[in-house]
Amino acid sequence: MDIEIRREREDDYRKVEELTREAFWDIHFPGCDEHYLVHVLRSHPDFIPELDYVALVDGKIVGNIMYAKAFVENENGERLEVISFGPVSVLPSYQHKGVGTSLIQHSLRQAMNMGHKVVVIYGHPYNYCKYGFVGAKSLNISDENGRFPYSMLAIEIQKGFLNNHKWKFIPSRVYELDSAESEKFDKTFPKKETGFKPSQEEFRIACHAYVE
C-alpha cells in the first residue's frame, strides 16, 4: 500500500475532523473529543502548522498528525521549548497498515530539520517506544506535580539536550478542552451511538498509573 504524506490544507479540515472522530470514537470514553481538539488546535498560538500532516492512500485522506509547542522547566526555573504531538488519527479500516508509522516518522524527521530538540507526549508505551520514545522519567522529566505518569513519554531528537537537570513538563493549554463546547461541536456531525469498549478501562488505568 502506497502512503503519501503531505501538509494539511484548509480544504482538508472537515475531512480530518471526520476521520479523527471515527478513529477515536468510544476508544477512551463513550464518544470522543479529539475531533474538537483538532478543530481548536489549528487556531491556537501553540499550533505548529509546519508539522501538521495528512496521510493519503489512493488520494483519500486516511490519517493525520498535529503538533503543539510546550515547555520543560528545570529546578532553577529555566524554561526550554519542546514540542508535543497529538492526536495521531488513522481511519479504523487503515489502522495497523503503516499509516501512523509513516506520519510519526515523517514528522519527527521534519521536526529535527526544523531544529526542535525534544518531543514529549502522552500515550501508551506499546505504541511509541518503537520510535525511540522512552518513559519520561528516564530523561528526568516529571509532570507539573513532580510525578512520573506511566503514559508520559519523551524522545531527545538532539541527544543529551536535557542532561544534568530535573525537568517538569508544561503542556500546551490547548489540550484542556471545554467539554460543553466539545459536545456542541460534535452535534455538527452525524449522530453516532456511544458505548463501552475495554480500551476505555485500559485508558482509565493508564491515566492513574505512575512510575515510582
Predicted region positions:
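Active-site rim helix/loop that mediates acceptor-substrate recognition in acyltransferases
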Residues: 17-20, 24-72
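A conserved beta-turn-beta hairpin within the catalytic core of GNAT-like acetyltransferases
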Residues: 71-84, 95
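A short beta-loop-alpha structural element at the N-terminal edge
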Residues: 3-16
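Internal, conserved structured core segments that host functional sites
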Residues: 51, 55, 86-89, 115-124
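Conserved active-site alpha-helix within GNAT-family acetyltransferase domains
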Residues: 113-117, 122-147
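Short loop segments at secondary-structure junctions
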Residues: 58-59, 93, 156-161
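Conserved acetyl-CoA-binding loop-helix of GNAT-fold acetyltransferases
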Residues: 85, 90, 96-109, 120-121
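Acidic/histidine-enriched, glycine/proline-rich intrinsically disordered or flexible terminal extensions
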Residues: 161-212
